[in-house]
C-alpha cells in the first residue's frame, strides 16, 4: 500500500542485508553483486505471497526493495530467492513495516533465518550455496550439473558458478559437495 504523508508518497521499502556463501569473501568482507528476488508472504499457512520485488545486492550484501501491496504493522515472512542458493526465510513470526520502512539483516545472527538455516563464514552468516536446479536441496542432481559443466570448462553467468568467477570448476563443486554431504535443504514454516 502506498502511503501519503503530507503530500509525499511513501512507497514501502525493505532494506535487506544478506550474503550468499559461495560469493562472500570473509577476508575482504565483500561479496559479489547479484540479483535477488524477495517475496513478502503471509505469516499464516499456506504462506501466500503478498508482494514481490527484484533488486541487485551490492558488494556489502545490501539491497533496497520497493513494495506496493504491504501495510505498516502487519507481520510478513521475508522469503529470499537467489539463483544458486537455498531459499531463505526470515525468523519465525515474521517482520513488519513501520513508517513504510523495514530493515532486516540476515548476516549478523543465525536466528534471523528461519530454522537457523545459514552457514557462518568469518563473522557473518550466509545463505547456503549449491541449489543450482532450485529443487530445495543441495544434492546429487546439483553436483551432477556442476560436475558436467566443470568438465566442459563452462564459462559465463551460470547457476553452476557458485563463487561468480565466471567459470564453473572444482571450487564450485567443492562448495556444493560440502552442502550435499550435510544434507542442506530449504527450511520454511
Indicate residue ranges for each PLM-predicted region:
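Short Pro-Gly-centered beta-turn/loop motif in secreted/extracellular proteins
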Residues: 61-76, 84
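Low-complexity, Pro/Thr/Ser/Gly/Ala-rich linker/spacer regions in secreted
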Residues: 3-14, 126, 187-189
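Short, acidic Ser/Thr/Gly-rich low-complexity loop/linker segments typical of extracellular
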Residues: 44-62
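Short coil-to-beta strand junction motifs in C2/discoidin
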Residues: 28-37, 73
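Structured interaction patches on ligand/partner-binding surfaces of diverse proteins
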Residues: 1, 56-57, 85-117
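Alpha-helical segments with a strong preference for the paired helices of cellulosomal dockerin domains
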Residues: 110, 114-119, 132-159, 163-189
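Beta-strand signatures of extracellular beta-sandwich domains
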Residues: 35-41, 77-79
Amino acid at each position: 500500500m502506498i502511503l501519503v504523508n503530507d503530500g509525499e508518497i511513501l512507497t514501502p521499502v525493505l532494506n535487506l542485508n544478506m550474503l550468499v556463501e559461495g560469493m562472500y569473501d570473509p577476508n575482504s568482507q565483500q561479496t559479489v553483486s547479484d540479483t535477488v528476488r524477495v517475496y513478502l508472504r503471509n505469516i499464516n499457512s499456506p504462506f501466500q505471497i503478498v508482494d514481490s520485488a527484484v533488486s541487485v545486492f551490492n558488494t556489502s550484501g545490501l539491497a533496497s526493495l520497493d513494495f506496493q501491496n504491504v501495510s505498516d504493522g502487519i507481520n510478513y515472512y521475508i522469503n529470499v530467492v537467489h539463483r544458486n542458493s537455498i531459499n531463505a526465510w526470515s525468523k519465525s513470526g515474521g517482520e513488519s513495516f513501520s513508517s513504510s520502512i523495514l530493515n532486516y539483516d540476515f548476516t549478523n545472527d543465525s536466528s534471523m533465518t528461519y530454522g537457523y538455516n545459514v552457514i557462518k563464514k568469518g563473522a557473518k552468516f550466509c545463505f547456503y550455496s549449491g541449489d543450482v536446479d532450485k529443487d530445495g536441496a543441495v544434492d546429487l542432481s546439483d553436483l551432477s550439473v556442476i560436475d558436467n559443466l566443470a568438465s566442459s570448462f563452462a564459462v559465463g553467468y551460470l547457476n553452476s558458478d557458485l563463487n561468480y568467477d565466471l567459470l564453473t570448476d572444482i571450487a564450485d563443486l567443492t562448495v556444493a559437495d560440502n552442502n550435499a554431504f550435510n544434507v542442506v535443504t530449504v527450511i520454511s514454516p
